[in-house]
A protein has these predicted regions:
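Glycine-rich phosphate/adenosyl-contacting loop at the front of the ribokinase-like
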Residues: 1-64, 78, 238-241
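Structural alpha-helical scaffold elements that stabilize or flank donor/cofactor-binding regions
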Residues: 109-110, 166-167, 204
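Proline-centered loop/turn at the N-terminus of a beta-strand
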Residues: 4, 147, 173, 209-210
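Conserved N-terminal subdomain of the carbohydrate kinase-like
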Residues: 39-121, 138-144
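Active-site flanking residues adjacent to catalytic metal/cofactor-binding acidic residues
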Residues: 9-10, 44, 150-152, 176, ...
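Conserved beta-alpha-beta core of the PfkB/ribokinase-like small-molecule kinase fold
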Residues: 116, 121-201, 218-220, 225-226
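Conserved phosphate-binding/catalytic region of the ribokinase-like
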Residues: 1-3, 192-248
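Conserved strand-to-helix beginnings and helix N-cap segments that scaffold or border functional pockets
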Residues: 19, 52-53, 104, 129-131, ...
Length: 248
């Protein structure tokens, strides 16, 4: 059966002034999918260290199915500090475990049983994980209803035009926020100032099944091929789903 839904990419700890909290969009995605009763997996890598063991423990406690390799790199962390005005500043550590997700025989078997996968741009900052993500996408069987969801997440300088273009071509669903859309439009030279026009350009250029534009408190928009109309979704807080948190 090809009905597994996968969240693939970074698994890490956000280290805040008040303590650490588990983070990573792929794990968040897989967790919330599982809460709807679907068969999900999180695919990532952690280190052979205490932080890595803690991530595995949290996922097990949450009954989140996973395919996580332990590798000879430290478990990923994001250092969160506050400036003098209380604005958070983020430092995403480099050379960590989720930068080095290996493509194993077990991962190949998972890809062959996957109907939908969600991946981002951050986990592709390193060549090893980028190659693994692309091999996974290319290994997935070409079946009706298959979804390759690119949840773009532009962080610091951990993205490039080449990686983004390749991901646009490999995905069939794109999720992007309004700030990221402005950045992408500048990088690729998309004309006009209307955000919806830019979404239609992306939808057509990359033959997407769907494009989801999130605009924070201003709501979200869903674009699909066909007549130019889009569905407006109500705003519920920020553009990100509630995060998976460590059990207290």
């Amino acid at each position: 059966m090809n009905n597994i839904i996968v969240g693939m990419g970074e698994a890490l700890w956000d280290v805040l002034p008040e303590g650490k909290k588990i983070g990573g969009a792929p794990a968040n995605f897989a967790y919330h999918v599982s809460q709807f009763g679907f068969d999900s997996r999180v695919v990532s890598a952690v280190g052979r260290d205490e932080l890595g063991e803690e991530i595995l423990k949290v996922f097990n406690e949450k009954k989140l199915k996973m395919q996580i390799e332990q590798v000879d790199y430290p478990t990923g962390t994001v250092q969160v500090t506050l400036d003098d005005e209380g604005v958070p500043c983020y430092e995403i550590k480099e050379g960590v475990a989720w930068d080095n997700i290996p493509f194993t025989d077990e991962l190949k078997r998972l890809a062959l049983s996957t109907r939908a996968v969600c991946f981002g741009s951050l986990a592709q900052r390193n060549e090893v994980s980028r190659a693994t993500i692309n091999r996974f996408l290319d290994t997935m069987p070409d079946i009706d209803g298959q979804l390759k969801i690119f949840d773009i997440n532009l962080r610091q300088d951990f993205y490039s035009k080449e990686v983004l273009r390749e991901s646009f071509h490999r995905c069939n669903v794109l999720k992007i926020n309004d700030e990221e859309l402005v950045t992408i439009s500048r990088m690729f030279g998309y004309p006009g100032i209307d955000l919806q026009d830019k979404c239609w350009i992306l939808l057509a250029k990359y033959n997407l099944k769907m494009l989801i534009l999130t605009c924070g408190i201003n709501g979200s928009y869903v674009f699909t091929p066909g007549p130019r109309q889009c569905k407006i979704c109500a705003a519920i807080g920020k553009d990100k789903a509630p995060r998976l948190r460590e059990r207290k």
